[in-house]
C-alpha cells in the first residue's frame, strides 16, 4: 500500500533516472548554468500564459520541468553537487513556481483569488519544509511536491486548449487545494517527529 505522505510520482523516480542519466552524461555544462536556463525558460512560459496562449505556456513549462530534472542529474553524475548549487536550484524553483502562476492569472485563465491561493499554498509547502529542515528534520513528504504540481498545470493547460479554458482554472483550484493538503501533511509529519 502506498504511503499517503509519499509524493505521487516518487515510485517513478528510478524509471525517470534511467531515461535522464544517459542524457546528463553527455552534458559538459555546469549544473548551475542548466538551473539558470531552466528558470529563464520558466519566465518565457509565464509570458506565454500571460499572452493568452495555453499551448505556448505549456510547451515552455514542460521544457522548464525537463531542464529542472536534468540539472540535478548533471550535478549528481558529471560534477560534484555543491551546497550553493542546491540553494540556487531551490530558490529558482520557488521563483519559477510563482511566476508561472502569475502568468496564468495575468492571462485570464484563473481568477485573482484562485491565483493568490495557489501562490500562498505553494509558499507554505516550501516554508514548512524549510522550517522543518532548520530543526534537523528531512521533510520531503506530501502528496503533491513540485513535479506533481507541474503535471497538474500541464494537464489543465492541455485540457484547456483542447476542450475549454475552464480546465485551466480547475487545475489551479486543484493545485491550491493539494498545496494546502501537502502543507498539513508536512505539519503532521513534523509534529510526529518532534513529540
From Swiss-Prot:
GO MF term (any one): phosphotransferase activity, for other substituted phosphate groups
Record keywords, A-Z: Cell membrane, Lipid biosynthesis, Lipid metabolism, Magnesium, Manganese, Membrane, Metal-binding, Phospholipid metabolism, Transferase, Transmembrane, Transmembrane helix
Gene Ontology cellular component list: membrane; plasma membrane
Known pathway: Lipid metabolism; phospholipid metabolism
Record organism: Methanothermobacter thermautotrophicus (strain ATCC 29096 / DSM 1053 / JCM 10044 / NBRC 100330 / Delta H)
Gene3D superfamilies xrefs: 1.20.120.1760
Residues annotated as binding Mg(2+) 1: 68, 71, 89
Similarity comment text for this entry: Belongs to the CDP-alcohol phosphatidyltransferase class-I family.
Tree of life domain: Archaea
Protein known as: Archaetidylinositol phosphate synthase
Cofactor note (record): Binds 2 Mg(2+) or Mn(2+) ions per subunit.
Glycoprotein found in the keyword field: no
Cofactor(s) recorded in Swiss-Prot or TrEMBL: Mn(2+); Mg(2+)
Predominant cellular place of this UniProt entry's protein: membrane
Subcellular localization: Cell membrane
EC number: 2.7.8.39
UniProt: Mg(2+) 2 binding residues: 68, 89, 93
Purpose of the protein: Catalyzes the formation of archaetidylinositol phosphate (AIP) from CDP-archaeol (CDP-ArOH or CDP-2,3-bis-(O-phytanyl)-sn-glycerol) and 1L-myo-inositol 1-phosphate (IP or 1D-myo-inositol 3-phosphate). AIP is a precursor of archaetidyl-myo-inositol (AI), an ether-type inositol phospholipid ubiquitously distributed in archaea membranes and essential for glycolipid biosynthesis in archaea.
A Pfam family that the UniProt record links to this protein: CDP-OH_P_transf
TM region(s), chain numbering: 27-47, 54-74, 99-119, 158-178
Amino acid at each position: 500500500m502506498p504511503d499517503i505522505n509519499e509524493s505521487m510520482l516518487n515510485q517513478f523516480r528510478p524509471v525517470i533516472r534511467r531515461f535522464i542519466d544517459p542524457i546528463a552524461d553527455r552534458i559538459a555544462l555546469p549544473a548551475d548554468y542548466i538551473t539558470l536556463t531552466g528558470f529563464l525558460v520558466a519566465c518565457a512560459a509565464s509570458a506565454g500564459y500571460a499572452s493568452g496562449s495555453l499551448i505556448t505556456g505549456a510547451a515552455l513549462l514542460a521544457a522548464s520541468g525537463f531542464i529542472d530534472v536534468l540539472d540535478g542529474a548533471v550535478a549528481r553524475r558529471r560534477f560534484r553537487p555543491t551546497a550553493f548549487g542546491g540553494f540556487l536550484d531551490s530558490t529558482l524553483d520557488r521563483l519559477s513556481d510563482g511566476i508561472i502562476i502569475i502568468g496564468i492569472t495575468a492571462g485570464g485563465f484563473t481568477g485573482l483569488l484562485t491565483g493568490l491561493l495557489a501562490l500562498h499554498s505553494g509558499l507554505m509547502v516550501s516554508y514548512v519544509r524549510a522550517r522543518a529542515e532548520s530543526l534537523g528534520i528531512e521533510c520531503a513528504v506530501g502528496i503533491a511536491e513540485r513535479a506533481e504540481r507541474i503535471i497538474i498545470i500541464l494537464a489543465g493547460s492541455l485540457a484547456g486548449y483542447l476542450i475549454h479554458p475552464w480546465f485551466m482554472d480547475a487545475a489551479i483550484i486543484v493545485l491550491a487545494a493539494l498545496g494546502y493538503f501537502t502543507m498539513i501533511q508536512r505539519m503532521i509529519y513534523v509534529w510526529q517527529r518532534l513529540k
